[in-house]
Every structure is written in structure tokens, then in C-alpha cells.
Amino acid sequence: MATKLNKKDRLRQLKIEIDKNPFYTDDELAELFSVSVQTIRLDRMELGIPELRERIKNVAEENYHKVKAIVGSEIVGELIDLELGKSGISVFEPTPDMAFLKTKIIRGHYIYSQAESLAISVIDAEAALIGVANIKYKYPVRIGDRLVAKAEVIRKRGNKYFVWVMIKVKNKEVFRGKFILASLESDNTEKEVQ
């Protein structure tokens, strides 16, 4: 915003911005409106808009009931958007205990787990397993990074789902994976996955 808004206009615009993107941090909003973080927090309180973590949690809770293949609590990160059989988005903020002590870089299996659980969540099946995973870690993820994963079902052939997952930190791709998932019939879980 080029010019500073008066309080009434700022409150109105703040509501519009958070409605458009509920994942803005208070720091980002303060920069956007050229005010202090404290001013943004007071404005949010006045409008009854919860803090970022609560907004993410609220959006995620609306989506967990849609998931068929795994239990919502098994999803790594917060599931913020889900269209079964098509696409999904999750947000994950790794904690310091997930990092290597020396480098403060997040261990790869946490990043993979976010991608895997999102890939399983987006397919429209009662039970599924990863049959093939072709993954690439592109950049290190550090403590404090917020990972935004987007999954898309590219194709379905028989009981196989082809899902692409990209994970970004601040619009920079840090991980990508192509997964082939097998939908399992509930009475035949011993069937070969590939």
C-alpha cells in the first residue's frame, strides 16, 4: 500500500486482505499496511480475527473430515484445502527438534512425510499406499520455515493414482515428488501395490 490509510479504511482493507489470504503473518500485514505489528494485532482483535495459527487451524478442521484414506491426525501439517480426487494444500512448520543439531536443517523424512500424507489425502479412496515415489530435495529447509505443499492428481488408471506434490518455502520450491499410489480394496490389503 503506497499511502497510509486512516484506521477505518485500514480495518476494512485488513479484513479484505485476510479474507483473500488467511495465511498472512502479522509481520507481512504490518509491512503491507506500513504500520507496526502491534497495530495489526490490535486491528485484528478489534475485527475479531484470530492470529495466524488459529486461522490455519480453523481452515484445516474444515478439511479433515473429507479425507478418506488416512485419519486427519496422521496428516503432517495442517490440511488447508482439499478437493478429493483432484488437489490439496497443506502447511507445515517444522519444530527445532526436527532439525539436525549442527546445521539446523530440517531432516528430509519430515518433508517427505508432509508430501506423502498429502498425496494419500487427495486421492478418493478408502485405503491407499505409496507404490512408487520419485522425489527431489531442491533446497535445504531450516527451522522457522513454513512449508506449503500442493498436491495434484494428474491421472487415475485403474486402482492407480498419479500424484505430483510440490513443497515451497516463500514461493521457492524446496521439494517435489511424483507418487504412484495404489488404492487398496478393504477386503484385500495383501494385493501387490505395484
UniProtKB/Swiss-Prot annotation:
* UniProt xrefs under NCBIfam families: PRK04424.1
> Quick check: keyword Transcription regulation in the entry?
yes
**Could you give a single Gene Ontology term from the biological process aspect?**
negative regulation of fatty acid biosynthetic process
Give UniProt keywords alphabetically.
Answer: DNA-binding, Fatty acid biosynthesis, Fatty acid metabolism, Lipid biosynthesis, Lipid metabolism, Repressor, Transcription, Transcription regulation
Family designation: Belongs to the FapR family.
Its biological purpose is as follows: Transcriptional factor involved in regulation of membrane lipid biosynthesis by repressing genes involved in fatty acid and phospholipid metabolism.
The name on file for this protein is Transcription factor FapR
Q: Which Pfam families match?
A: 4HBT
Q: Does the keyword Mitochondrion apply?
A: no
Which residues lie in coiled coils? none
Question: What Gene Ontology molecular-function terms does this entry list?
Answer: DNA binding; DNA-binding transcription factor activity
